[in-house]
A protein has these predicted regions:
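Active-site cofactor/cluster-binding pocket
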Residues: 2-201
Length: 201
């Protein structure tokens, strides 16, 4: 599969729920880019990192001055939970790409019966109205298969890096996992990334 040019300028928007490793994934992808000589600017947009809160972050590759991503500007949206993918959709430009978990993690309002969780098919349909390409992966299930549900975010990164849409290859991501993650969780995350790659093959 071809890979975007190392000189590509991309705006990536991440959205998830606290406890899912959204910020860890953002930082890992940023480090992978920097290791390859790609300029990377990132930042937390909105953080309620305690378990269950909404977490949003941005990563801009290729020489941007500010980590800010406004509505309709993101080239790629990484959603770590389907409903959060839907909430982050306004930030995606028309014709952009989405990588999303298809495994719901119902928010407290749904758990308490105060709100209804939309079906995954409805979420897919709304994403299809904006995104030219979209992948929905059972990230929590694949993370569990890799050895830890906490590696679900790495499943998404593996899929994104294997898609050819980023200026990073899958091998670049694997190298960053080996270099930047603690030794005790490297094998699990490498396995998770591989499952993500296989899901978009």
């Amino acid at each position: 599969m071809t890979t975007a040019s190392r000189d590509a300028r991309l705006r990536i928007y991440f959205v998830g729920v606290g406890g899912q490793g959204t910020l860890t994934a953002t930082n890992l992808l940023a480090r992978a880019a920097l290791d390859c000589g790609i300029e990377a600017v990132g930042g937390e947009v909105h953080g309620m990192a305690q378990r269950g809160g909404v977490v949003e972050s941005a990563l801009l590759l290729g020489g941007w001055r500010s980590p800010r991503v406004d509505r309709g500007e993101a080239d790629i949206l990484l959603g770590f939970e389907p409903l959060e993918t839907l909430r982050g959709l306004p930030y995606l430009r028309q014709g952009g790409a989405v990588f999303s978990s298809s495994d719901p993690l119902a928010p407290l309002s749904v758990a308490l019966g105060q709100a209804v969780y939309p079906g995954i098919e409805r979420i897919r349909a709304q994403v299809a109205e904006v995104a030219a390409k979209a992948w929905f992966l059972p990230c929590r299930s694949l993370g569990r298969e890799a050895g830890s549900v906490q590696s679900a975010g790495t499943v998404l990164l593996g899929a994104a890096c294997a898609s050819g849409l980023l200026p990073l290859t899958f091998d670049d991501l694997a190298a960053a996992i080996r270099k930047h993650l603690p030794a005790k969780i490297q094998a699990v995350n490498l396995a998770a990334a591989e499952l993500g790659r296989a899901a978009v093959a």
